[in-house]
Amino acid sequence: MKKIAIYPGTFDPLHKGHIDIIRRAVGLWDELYIAVADSPHKGTLFSLEERKAMIQNEFEESKNIKVISFNNLLIDLASSLSARILVRGLRVVSDFEYEFQMLGMNRTMNPDIETVFLMAEPQNQPISSN
């Protein structure tokens, strides 16, 4: 059985911190979906298609990375893709507090899906998207 993971985000824009997490995560599972959130309420700088294209261009050589978009609950997306892992990057303590709350909600909705946290490299900790 393939081990499938999802790294979700808005990626507005894709930056060095995202790229670092993706490069580290891609070798851990058979397939890594980069799930770009369609978040019209966030007032993104770049369109959904532009954000997807940034990621596709950066990782065009990677055969086990798939770039998709989503506008529903992440946990539902994971179930539809048979993904058992959600990948999240952590930079600072406030990231952990938010992610801990999300982890609790996700575990309530689907206890079979695990969340794996990758710490940002020190040089990428100050970097944040929009």
Which residues fall in each region the model found?
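Nucleotidyltransferase catalytic core that binds NTPs
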Residues: M1-N130
